[in-house]
């Protein structure tokens, strides 16, 4: 049964959504909120390319994510470095796992966070089933991924690779000030005027 009130509500929501998207495009702002997925990576990479095509002005990328699919995070990380405009990453809420990988794609001086942001670094994890030989292949791949991520975080923070490996052996939580001291964050900001 069709409900005309529901149809009318959807019609009124659509322009607001388009208007909000247009305003975000004009402000050159992208939001990564939630789990990192292939779908989110496609959306964010498309937005980065579209904003880069529109102008060379700086882009602001807000990150609030529990992490997710590492390869999708890699895609966004690499695209941030690939586009011509400067990309500022601004952490808010929590920046964890693959979300932290995306966050550190910007040069240190372009990595900011809000005061209550929490960061989580840790080893990649995964589950596999199947034949022993396939499980062995997956184990080797996750070890390679862990070593690669340790190198990325070492380069981004200035911390030695062995320290990153030790710290991320288990969940490694940092508040905003701790993340700044660790080299993840350059500045803690409280207003958009500070960006």
Swiss-Prot record:
Gene3D superfamilies in alphabetical order: 2-enoyl-CoA Hydratase, Chain A, domain 1 (3.90.226.10)
Localization terms from the record: Cytoplasm
UniProt key word Protease: yes
Primary residence: cytoplasm
Catalytic activity: Hydrolysis of proteins to small peptides in the presence of ATP and magnesium. alpha-casein is the usual test substrate. In the absence of ATP, only oligopeptides shorter than five residues are hydrolyzed (such as succinyl-Leu-Tyr-|-NHMec, and Leu-Tyr-Leu-|-Tyr-Trp, in which cleavage of the -Tyr-|-Leu- and -Tyr-|-Trp bonds also occurs)
Record CDD domains: S14_ClpP_2
Active site: 97, 122
Subunit and interaction comment: Fourteen ClpP subunits assemble into 2 heptameric rings which stack back to back to give a disk-like structure with a central cavity, resembling the structure of eukaryotic proteasomes.
Protein name as it appears in the record: ATP-dependent Clp protease proteolytic subunit 3
Species the sequence originates in: Rhizobium meliloti (strain 1021)
Classification lineage: Bacteria, Pseudomonadati, Pseudomonadota, Alphaproteobacteria, Hyphomicrobiales
Gene: clpP3
